């Protein structure tokens, strides 16, 4: 009975051993990485600028919606 239970495990282990080690990852090209840094920084700066420019409009919309909510708020009479 034990042999029947261990047989699938043995098959899987043998398949893993026969497969061998996983292939190594290729080394990244350092020169292309350094060439891409200025573009990445420029894109990050543009995204940051756009985000900060949208803050006043988003704040204005939020305050307007709060003002509308307060204006429409009614306290029920007891």
UniProtKB/Swiss-Prot annotation:
Signal peptide per UniProt: 1-26
Compartment annotation: Secreted
GO molecular function: fatty acid binding; phospholipase inhibitor activity
InterPro entries given in the database record: ApoC-I
GO terms under biological process: lipid transport; lipoprotein metabolic process; negative regulation of cholesterol transport; negative regulation of lipid catabolic process; negative regulation of very-low-density lipoprotein particle clearance; triglyceride metabolic process; very-low-density lipoprotein particle clearance
Sorted UniProt keywords: Lipid transport, Secreted, Signal, Transport, VLDL
Cellular component, GO annotation: high-density lipoprotein particle; very-low-density lipoprotein particle
PANTHER family, per database record: APOLIPOPROTEIN C-I
Reported function: Inhibitor of lipoprotein binding to the low density lipoprotein (LDL) receptor, LDL receptor-related protein, and very low density lipoprotein (VLDL) receptor. Associates with high density lipoproteins (HDL) and the triacylglycerol-rich lipoproteins in the plasma and makes up about 10% of the protein of the VLDL and 2% of that of HDL. Appears to interfere directly with fatty acid uptake and is also the major plasma inhibitor of cholesteryl ester transfer protein (CETP). Binds free fatty acids and reduces their intracellular esterification.
Family listed: Belongs to the apolipoprotein C1 family.
Name the UniProt record assigns to this protein: Apolipoprotein C-I
Organism listed in the record: Panthera pardus
């Amino acid at each position: 009975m034990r042999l029947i239970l261990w047989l699938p495990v043995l098959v899987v282990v043998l398949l893993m051993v026969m497969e061998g080690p996983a292939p190594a990852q290729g080394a990244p090209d350092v020169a292309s990485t350094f060439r891409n840094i200025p573009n990445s920084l420029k894109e990050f700066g543009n995204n940051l600028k756009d985000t900060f420019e949208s803050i006043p409009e988003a704040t204005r919309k939020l305050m307007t919606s709060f003002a509308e909510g307060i204006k429409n708020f009614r306290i029920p009479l007891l």
